A protein has these predicted regions:
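Catalytic cores of secreted or luminal carbohydrate-active enzymes
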Residues: 141-192
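Hydrophobic, well-ordered secondary-structure elements that form the walls
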Residues: 37, 74, 147, 214, ...
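A broadly conserved detector of short glycine/acidic/proline-rich loop/turn motifs that flank catalytic sites
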Residues: 40, 78-80, 153, 208, ...
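C-terminal beta-sandwich/jelly-roll accessory domains of carbohydrate-active enzymes
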Residues: 220-272
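C-terminal extensions
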Residues: 52-55, 59-82, 87-88, 171, ...
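Structural beta-strand/beta-sheet cores of well-ordered domains, especially the beta-sheet scaffolds
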Residues: 5, 70-72, 93, 145, ...
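Active-site neighborhood of glycoside hydrolase catalytic domains
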Residues: 2-141, 151-166
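Carbohydrate-binding surface patches
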Residues: 194-237
Length: 272
């Protein structure tokens, strides 16, 4: 139980207490962002349907608080995806996908979560490497490439970063701002399933089909093999698309029906 007790949110007086207590804190500090991090599960429920009553109480609390503080960004917490909830997105537009922020582990998490929830609701951050949970060492590029397809952010100790890493982060933030509208309003396509192959790829296409973002990842380096071809989806077959990194131009028809082989580095955990 993590030394935690659960408040009975099925009771109106408890909900009012929480609303008043949280509102008092938010009203007396310069707060622009708040994350609700709830890890304790419900056990020994007193009656059938109690979990539903509890959820309605939680919605009541968040409805009151967000109405009082419309300029604060609230983020939910998932504990591995279990608390992603379409209803709570009315109050918290983004949810922390998992405390496991390792970029390679996140491939499957974000791929799966995106089947039910929009890209802009999936909190995905660049965190320190080696990862604090699994010890995996991934490049700053790989961590950012995976995190772009979500809310994007950084969670690491900047005092331990080199000047070169700071410059790389500046470039990443500049790029993220370019694709921000695309991630919020574009259409997502899952191209390569990481559960079935050594690769993962997804794509976001703007509504007018003029702009696309594609991420492709090779999980493990394998000797004497060609990378899996990536075939895009949802493009205009009559349009020409320019790769902003290489300058190469491809037709939408070519990208969808012929596809391209990603130019991965010869190492594990490589992204393009």
């Amino acid at each position: 139980s993590r030394n935690q007790m659960v408040l009975d949110l099925s009771r109106d007086e408890v909900c009012e207490y929480v609303i008043n207590a949280v509102s008092d804190i938010l009203a007396n500090a310069n707060i622009g962002y708040a994350k609700r991090d709830m890890i304790r599960q419900l056990t020994d429920m007193p009656r059938l349907g109690y979990n539903h009553e509890y959820t309605l109480g939680y919605y009541k609390i968040m409805s009151a608080i967000t109405e009082k503080f419309p300029n604060i960004l609230f983020e939910g917490c998932s504990a591995g995806g279990g608390r992603f909830d379409a209803g709570v997105l009315a109050y918290m537009p983004q949810i922390w996908t998992s405390d496991n922020s390792d970029a390679i582990a996140r491939l499957k998490m974000q791929y799966s979560t995106s089947m039910c929830y929009p890209v802009y609701s999936i909190s995905s951050h660049v965190t320190a490497s080696p990862n604090h949970q699994c010890g995996r060492d991934t490049s700053l590029k790989t961590r950012a490439d995976v995190a772009y397809c979500g809310t994007f952010g950084y969670e690491l100790d900047v005092t331990k970063m080199s000047d070169e890493e700071f410059e790389e982060i500046k470039a990443q933030i500049k790029f993220e701002k370019r694709i921000q509208d695309l991630m919020c309003n574009g259409d997502l396509y899952r191209l390569i399933n990481p559960y079935e192959t050594n690769y993962c790829s997804w794509e976001v296409v703007s509504k007018d089909k003029k702009h696309i973002f594609v991420m492709a990842c090779k999980v493990l380096a394998v000797a004497q093999t060609k990378s899996e071809k990536v075939k895009l989806q949802g493009l205009d077959t009559n349009k020409q698309y320019r790769n902003t990194f290489t300058g190469k131009v491809y037709s939408g028809d070519f990208l969808m029906y012929h596809g391209i082989r990603a130019n991965y580095e010869m190492k594990d955990f490589s992204t393009v």
